[in-house]
Amino acid sequence: MEIPIKIIQASKSDLAEIETLQASSFPAEKQQPSHILEESIRKCADTFLLARDENQLLGYILGGPYPHNPKCLEIHSLVIDTDHQRQGLGTLLLAALKDVAVELDYKAIRLKSPDELLSYFEMNGFIDEEETDSLYAASQGFSRIWFNLF
């Protein structure tokens, strides 16, 4: 029997699990401090989404308003537990964030991507920002963007 994955909004009670997952995924210098994560839960509750099974945090995506354009979201983190990578959880979280973006009337989602993940984000509908000629295309160092066409 397969255990269903739930996508839920992060809450303060999830903070310890989020920190544990982050610590197992990033070196110390790339981890967000606890107070920043807590502030993100408070300020970005709609766009801080968790993937959970019955009793374990499997991954999360954290997005927030892009400071230079409040109608655009920026993905700050996409983290999947190493034992659950390559099982579609990242794609599930990206799809959930896109749904939230449509619901909240954001016009686009931006992200920075390391070279080894470019094709993954392209598969999920993100395009090279340099290929766009829109007000969202700017030389802010973002390499991928998804447009809300709804």
Region annotations inferred by a language model:
Residues I80, R86-D99:
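Conserved acetyl-CoA-binding loop-helix of GNAT-fold acetyltransferases
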Residues P4-I18:
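A short beta-loop-alpha structural element at the N-terminal edge
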